[in-house]
Structures are given as C-alpha cells and as structure tokens.
C-alpha cells in the first residue's frame, strides 16, 4: 500500500474548481512523542471545529520529513487555499516528530505549491521575516504567511486558531482578505498575549512584514 493511501485524511476533499482554489483548510500536524502520549493534538481539534463551521478540512498527522514532502504535493493537488501546519518550531527551524527541518529546507519542500494560497503556521517563534522571506522566495504567488512571533502554549494555540477560523469564516465563508486576517488576529493576539507575525502584500503590491498585538 502506498504511504499516501495509509495516511488517509480525516475528511473528504472537495472537487477542484476549474479556476482558482477552494476556500478550505488543509491541516498538517507533527508533534513530539510526549505530545502524542498526552494527546496534545491542536490540529486534530482544529479540524473538528472547522467541521462544526460547515467546512471540509483535510487533516493529516505525520512524523517525518519524507512524509512532509509527500504532504506538500498532496496539499497542492487538493486545490485547498489555506495550509495550516501545527508543529514545534524555533527562530530557525520547524520540527516533525523525528526530523528537524530548517526554514530553507521547508521553503524548498513547498516550492511552487503555495501560489494563490495562504500559509498559517502554529509553531513556536516561526513568526519572523526570515521564515516568510524564505517561503516567498520559492513561492512568488503566496498571498500571506502568519505564525506566532514567540513561544506559544498548547492551550493558547488551540483556542487562538479555533477562534481565528470561526470568526473569519463566520464573516465570509468563501474568502479572507489580508486586511480581514489582520483585523481578526489583532484582538486575539492581545487577548491571549500571543503576538503574530503577518507577511502580506500591501495595496501597492509590495510585500510587507509586521507583528500584530501581544
């Protein structure tokens, strides 16, 4: 059996539209062994919340860099617009259960697969201009990149991102603008004391970086 067949999603993919992407969330999660033992799976909870909102998220739990590479292609093929990654991180790298992946390697794995899509990363300290610039260097068409600017607790992360998606999709279930994302992130970042780094295009088409709230 192929690896991707074994990693069946918790949800059913929507059919591709002929033009553009579909406004759904593709969730990839990879935590350490202690998190697994204690069932601390933010992404799994988030998928359940999204289904309650009437969305059709795809959720995959992985453990290795090789599986992440397969997920990158699967995300691209899904035509889903929003990629949410839940994992451990630092100011220079992200981690799967068994492998460390520096920012440059992550950007290479997703090269060409984020055009016209938005990236949300729930990982400690991954919210910085270095990460966003490296991702964009391999994906000129990426719309935005958002991630915590400092370390974030598990309970805060699951409450933060669940609230973000519920609020954003309750306003418009078909799309989210960068201005709307910033407007929703600001009060949440202040409420939880968790600043978020958001990289996006301004009205002139210039790529800009900024930290919101906290």
Sequence positions of predicted segments:
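Catalytic cores of nucleophile-dependent amide-cleaving enzymes
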Residues: 98-159
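A domain-level signal for caspase-like cysteine endopeptidase catalytic cores
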Residues: 2-80, 122
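A glycine-rich, hydrophobic loop/mini-helix early in the fold
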Residues: 72-106
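Short, flexible/disordered intra-domain loops and linkers
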Residues: 33-38, 94-98, 173-174
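Caspase-like cysteine protease fold
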Residues: 100-109, 171-214
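Short acidic, S/G/P-rich loop/turn micro-motifs used as interaction or catalytic elements
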Residues: 32-36, 65-67, 89-93, 125-128, ...
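A generic structural motif
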Residues: 60-62, 145-152, 199-201
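Short, small-residue alpha-helix embedded
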Residues: 158-170
